[in-house]
């Protein structure tokens, strides 16, 4: 290599190192914010999944002819429980889509279950069922809030990662945009 090429290479490397320092700490902080928001989403979905067995058992006692709906809810819960939900999901569009679809299936199955319970006045009068229903409604609200925070946090992170000079820093340290929820 001649002196000019060596000089350009040195300048390029120096510029990359100087610019790559730009935003490094902020990238790390925003990445941690995304991870924290994702953990909250997971916690709320897990809380909902934990309510399902109790809800199914209470409904079984009253709605003996609704086996199909009860089976759908149980299968949806099993599907959700069988999914991988670590940080890799945030960087893998296919896994993220499967996770989102499984949660949507759970939401749909629970909605059908609650609709079926309208036909059973004795069940609706059951104190344990009412308590579980209130807990489920509260959990659905928490899920909505957690998802909203996650969407906002990912949007902030993804915007930052794509801006210059942070885009260079992100590329150097292997940080990529994160997956986000689509509309249900």
Could you say what each language-model-derived stretch is?
Residues 2-184:
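A helix-centric hydrophobic-segment signal that preferentially recognizes long
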């Amino acid at each position: 290599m001649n002196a000019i090429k060596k000089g350009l290479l040195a300048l390029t490397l120096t510029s990359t190192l100087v610019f790559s320092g730009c935003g490094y700490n902020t990238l790390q902080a925003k990445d941690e914010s995304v991870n924290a928001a994702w953990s909250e989403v997971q916690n709320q979905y897990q809380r909902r999944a934990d309510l399902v067995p109790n809800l199914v058992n209470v409904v079984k006692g009253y709605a003996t002819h609704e086996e199909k709906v009860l089976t759908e809810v149980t299968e949806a819960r099993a599907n959700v429980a069988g999914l991988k939900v670590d940080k890799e999901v945030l960087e893998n569009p296919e896994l993220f889509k499967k996770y989102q679809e499984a949660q949507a299936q759970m939401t749909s199955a629970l909605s059908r279950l609650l609709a079926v319970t309208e036909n059973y006045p004795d069940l609706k009068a059951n104190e344990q069922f009412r308590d579980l229903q209130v807990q489920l409604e509260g959990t659905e609200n928490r899920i909505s809030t957690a998802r909203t925070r996650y969407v906002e946090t990912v949007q902030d992170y993804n915007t930052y990662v794509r801006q210059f000079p942070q885009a260079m820093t992100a590329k150097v340290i292997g940080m990529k945009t994160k997956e986000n929820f689509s509309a249900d």
